[in-house]
Amino acid sequence: MGCRFCASTQGGRVRNLEAGEIAAEIYGVMRDTGERVSHVVLMGIGEPLDNFDNVMDFLEIVSCADGINIGMRNFSLSTCGLVPMIDKLAEKKLQLTLSVSLHAPENTMRSSMMPVNNAYPVEQLIDACRRYQQTTGRRISFEYSMVRGVNDSDQTAAMLAKLIRGMGAHVNLIPINPVDGSPYSASEIGRAHV
């Protein structure tokens, strides 16, 4: 999706994984560790909602009683904010946690870091999150990478609080890691503990 502070996007997209390939990762971890996997986070290279059908099939495979039987509340699905797909996911009424990579509370700032914001501006994204929450009854988790001098001011924090007020959301403040070739650096240590 081309997020400019993310090392995962530097290799470019090759293809989406099939449902069985995603499930094979879980089974591989269980085989290698000898332990049952109880929680799954769909995040990292790729956009889960851009691979919707395979992700839904994967969830069915590993959550069913004949599979690993992981409870749906033990899944977290991350998205950069594909608004139509958030609405489509809401229709499924799954009890997973939706983690939204927000990273900025206003459009100019978010677009400079995340090109997807040009297609789905902050206001549309937050409206979709509110619809998701109303439909599923699930709290949204907002991922917010702290970038020095870009999105870590007190004013930006106040804008973020105003933007999501009344949602009962969780905000995960994440100091970014250094990425070769990126103009971004992590906020000072204390900024992520506002």
What are these language model-derived features?
Residues M1-G20:
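Canonical Radical SAM [4Fe-4S] cluster-binding loop centered on the CxxxCxxC motif
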Residues A23-H39, G44-G190:
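Conserved AdoMet/S-adenosylmethionine-binding subsite of the radical SAM
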Residues A192-V194:
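Conserved small/polar residues in nucleotide/adenosyl-binding loops
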